[in-house]
């Protein structure tokens, strides 16, 4: 259930949706090609990850978690990433999204449930998102929060 109404269903001819990037969990997702397109962006890497024309399905929470997992600062310019780091970031996104799906996604309260009214449990596994001020699970440094492109961003200032 999409309480905040970020999503919607649209039946449209292919040419109307062809600009949407492929989901990282699709079998034909090309990490190397997507990494090259990611590195062509002149924005913060967090902003690039949220760009649904690059790859679809990575939202704010999973972007923060993927960046933490890959040890990449969300403020880093996407264009300065090495190809191998961009590929590693996309692999981290795939791992984060797969782990989240296995436990029903990320629910913080009863407003965010599936069609059967069940909450997801990935929020119990978050390493970065929503943990500002708490110690980094990797190095112990207090996590920080900032705003990037209007979105809350959570990260470790030491190991990212």
What role is predicted for each listed range?
Residues 1-160:
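Structured catalytic/nucleic-acid-binding cores of DNA maintenance enzymes
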């Amino acid at each position: 259930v999409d309480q905040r109404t970020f999503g919607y269903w649209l039946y449209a001819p292919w040419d109307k949706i062809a600009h949407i990037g492929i989901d990282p969990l699709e079998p034909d997702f090309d990490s190397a090609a997507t990494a090259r397109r990611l590195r062509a962006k002149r924005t913060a890497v967090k902003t690039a990850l949220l760009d649904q024309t690059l790859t679809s399905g990575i939202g704010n929470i999973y972007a923060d978690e993927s960046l933490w997992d890959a040890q990449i600062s969300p403020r880093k310019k996407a264009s300065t990433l090495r190809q191998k780091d961009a590929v590693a970031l996309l692999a981290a996104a795939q791992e984060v999204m797969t782990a989240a799906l296995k436990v029903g996604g990320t629910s913080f309260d009863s407003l965010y449930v599936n069609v059967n009214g069940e909450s997801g449990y990935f929020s119990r596994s978050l390493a970065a998102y929503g943990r500002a001020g708490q110690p980094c699970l990797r190095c112990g440094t207090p996590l920080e929060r900032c705003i990037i492109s209007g979105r809350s961003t959570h990260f470790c200032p030491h190991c990212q």
